[in-house]
C-alpha cells in the first residue's frame, strides 16, 4: 500500500521536476541575472527622464493636476520599498531641475526614456529567442504610445475612481472598496506583467502561459516588496556604512531585484510553452511506435 502511494506521488511530481529542470537550464543559458543587471543600470539612468516626461504630460493637461499627485503617491507607496519617501523627495528635486532644461535637453530626456523601453524589448526577445525584428518606425510608435498614453490612462483611471468614491450612493460600498484596494497593487502588477509578456515579444505567446507567468511574477514582486521593506526596517546596518548615501545602494538593489522578478516571470512563461511542446512531441512519438 505504501509503495503504491509513493509510486503515485513520484509519478505526479516527475513532470514538475522536469519542468523545473528545464526552467533552470533556460535561466542559465539566457544569463538572466546579467540581463537584469543591464536593465537595472539602464533603469537608473532613465528613471529621472522617464518620470520627468510622464509628469510633464500631466502638466500639459490641467484636468490631471490633482490626479498626478495621487498617481505619484500611489507609485511610490506601492512600487518602492519603505524608503520610498526619501527616494521620492530626491526624484522630485531632479524632475524640478529638469523642467529648467532647454529644448535640446528635453529631447535628450525623451531619448533616454525611450532607451529604457528599447532595452526591455531587447531583453524579452532575447529570452524568447526571437529572430524577428519589428520595423524601426513601428517600434518607435509603440514606445511613444506607451510613454504618452500609459500615464494618461492611469491618471484617467484614478480620476474616475475618485469621482465614483465621491458619489453618495458609493458611501455604503466603502468597506468593499477598501478591501478591493488592498489587492489592487497585486492586480495592477498582474495585468502589467501579462501585457508585457503578451505584447513585447515579436512571436506569439500563448495567453494561458502569459497569465501564469505574470501571476507568479506579481506574487514575487509583492512578496519581495514587503520582504525588502522588512529587511530595511529590521536591519538598518546599511545606514552605518553608507550614511546619507544609503538611498543609492537601496534603490539599485531594489531595481535589480525587480528586474530579476520580471525576467523570471518571462522565463516561466517561455518554459511553460516549451514544456508543453516537448510533452506533445514525446506523446506523439509514443503513439507512432508500433
From Swiss-Prot:
The chain crosses the membrane at residues 44-64, 104-124, 140-160, 183-203, 210-230, 244-264. It comes from Shigella boydii serotype 4 (strain Sb227). Signal peptide: none annotated. Its main location: membrane. Pfam families: Virul_fac_BrkB. Keywords: Cell inner membrane, Cell membrane, Membrane, Transmembrane, Transmembrane helix. HAMAP family: UPF0761. InterPro entries: UPF0761_bac, Virul_fac_BrkB. It comes from the Bacteria. It is found in: Cell inner membrane. GO terms for cellular component: plasma membrane. It is a multi-pass membrane protein. Belongs to the UPF0761 family. This is UPF0761 membrane protein YihY.
Amino acid at each position: 500500500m505504501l509503495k503504491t502511494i509513493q509510486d503515485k506521488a513520484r509519478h505526479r511530481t516527475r513532470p514538475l521536476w522536469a519542468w523545473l529542470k528545464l526552467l533552470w537550464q533556460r535561466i542559465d543559458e539566457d544569463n538572466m541575472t546579467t540581463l537584469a543587471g543591464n536593465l537595472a543600470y539602464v533603469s537608473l539612468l532613465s528613471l529621472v527622464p522617464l518620470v520627468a516626461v510622464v509628469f510633464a504630460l500631466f502638466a500639459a493637461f490641467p484636468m490631471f493636476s490633482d490626479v498626478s499627485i495621487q498617481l505619484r503617491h500611489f507609485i511610490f507607496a506601492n512600487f518602492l520599498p519603505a524608503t520610498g519617501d526619501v527616494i521620492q523627495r530626491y526624484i522630485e528635486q531632479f524632475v524640478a531641475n529638469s523642467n529648467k532644461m532647454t529644448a535640446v535637453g528635453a529631447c535628450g530626456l525623451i531619448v533616454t526614456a525611450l532607451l529604457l523601453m528599447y532595452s526591455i524589448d531587447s531583453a524579452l526577445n532575447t529570452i524568447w529567442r526571437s529572430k524577428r525584428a519589428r520595423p524601426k518606425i513601428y517600434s518607435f510608435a509603440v514606445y511613444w504610445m506607451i510613454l504618452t498614453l500609459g500615464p494618461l490612462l492611469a491618471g484617467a483611471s484614478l480620476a474616475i475612481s475618485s469621482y465614483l468614491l465621491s458619489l453618495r450612493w458609493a458611501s455604503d460600498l466603502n468597506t468593499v472598496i477598501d478591501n478591493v484596494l488592498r489587492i489592487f497593487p497585486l492586480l495592477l502588477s498582474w495585468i502589467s506583467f501579462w501585457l508585457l509578456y503578451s505584447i513585447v515579444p515579436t512571436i506569439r505567446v500563448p495567453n494561458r502561459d502569459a497569465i501564469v507567468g505574470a501571476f507568479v511574477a506579481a506574487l514575487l514582486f509583492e512578496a519581495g516588496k514587503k520582504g525588502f521593506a522588512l529587511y530595511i526596517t529590521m536591519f538598518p546596518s546599511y545606514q552605518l556604512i553608507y550614511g546619507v548615501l544609503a538611498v543609492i545602494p537601496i534603490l539599485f538593489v531594489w531595481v535589480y531585484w525587480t528586474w530579476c522578478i520580471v525576467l523570471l516571470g518571462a522565463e516561466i512563461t517561455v518554459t511553460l510553452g516549451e514544456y508543453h511542446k516537448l510533452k506533445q512531441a514525446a506523446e506523439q512519438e509514443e503513439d507512432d511506435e508500433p
